[in-house]
């Protein structure tokens, strides 16, 4: 009996240590490099996802300092930056500061479907089926974005038109769309880069063993919970997002993140 008690106590202690070390809410910046013959000078794109109006220090200082440290050429926001429950103040502060310092582009997610105008009021460019030719560091990009299908009944029509444009574009093509589960609909465009969010990293992770336990749309053991996926000729990157206090399920071994993509 004593041996069993010691064993159970040992198991409990190990589980407690495992959880404590995994309970990490320190903001990380995760970097990816994408090589392309279309690009001769590096272009740095910083991607924010799923902020859900969460707080990052006084005046969002922790988040804004991390963005500054990443030294992006442009900032993209791939949905659920606002929340449909938490008040908008933290997001308003974030967007206003970002737009003062970098070109910013925004697509809606399922929790901020009606917030495109609110983002635009801060100087952020909201994309709803739009294709924008950009020149960044003398490099030609075609930046495209889709509103969340919950908001946009024209989602399928917009996506078909954008896929057609991407197929013939000579510029480096980038698609912003909130939901990673729809990757099968995006791939016919032959995009060079697709950026999504929504999955919150699958909430619980075990690095090296489990990339995510549960995600919206995909359910248990989601295929596209977070990270980089090289699919055909497309680099698909899913941000694990920035949500903290807004989540019903705590994050485990899944710290909030910014995604920095350097195209070269």
Roles of regions detected by a PLM:
Residues 116, 121-123, 128-130, 136-177, ...:
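Binuclear metal-dependent hydrolase catalytic cores centered on His/Asp/Glu-rich metal-binding motifs
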Residues 10-90:
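N-terminal active-site segment of His-dependent metallophosphoesterases
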Residues 59-135:
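Core catalytic region of metal-dependent phosphoesterases/phosphodiesterases
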Residues 180-259:
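Conserved beta-sheet core of the metallophosphoesterase superfamily
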Residues 1-13:
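N-terminal Sec-pathway targeting helices
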Residues 27, 35-46, 124, 131-145, ...:
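Beta-strand-turn-beta hairpins that frame and shape the catalytic cleft
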Residues 47-49, 74-80, 104-110, 127-129, ...:
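Active-site neighborhood of phospho(di)ester-bond hydrolases with catalytic His/Asp-centered motifs
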């Amino acid at each position: 009996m004593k041996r069993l008690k010691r064993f159970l106590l040992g198991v409990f202690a190990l589980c407690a240590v495992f959880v404590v070390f995994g309970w990490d809410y320190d903001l990380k910046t995760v970097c990816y490099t994408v090589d392309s013959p279309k690009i001769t000078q590096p272009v740095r794109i910083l991607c924010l996802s799923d902020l859900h109006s969460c707080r990052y220090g006084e005046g969002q200082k922790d988040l804004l300092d991390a963005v500054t440290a990443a030294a992006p050429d442009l900032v993209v926001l791939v949905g659920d930056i606002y929340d449909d429950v938490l008040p908008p103040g933290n997001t308003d502060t974030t967007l206003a500061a970002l737009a003062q310092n970098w070109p910013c582009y925004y697509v809606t997610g399922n929790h901020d479907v009606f917030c495109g105008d609110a983002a635009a009021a801060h100087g952020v460019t909201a994309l709803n089926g739009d294709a924008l030719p950009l020149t960044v560091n003398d490099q030609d990009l075609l930046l495209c974005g889709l509103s969340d299908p919950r908001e946009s009944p024209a989602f399928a029509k917009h996506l078909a038109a954008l896929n057609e444009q991407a197929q013939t574009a000579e510029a480096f093509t980038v698609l912003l769309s909130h939901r990673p589960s729809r990757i099968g609909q995006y791939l016919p465009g032959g995009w060079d880069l697709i950026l999504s969010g929504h999955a919150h990293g699958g909430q619980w992770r075990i690095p090296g063993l489990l990339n995510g336990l549960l995600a919206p749309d995909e359910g248990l053991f989601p295929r596209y919970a977070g990270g980089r996926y090289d699919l055909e000729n497309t680099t698909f990157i899913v941000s694990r997002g920035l949500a903290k206090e807004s989540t019903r399920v705590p994050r485990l071994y899944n710290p909030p993140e910014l995604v920095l993509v350097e195209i070269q």
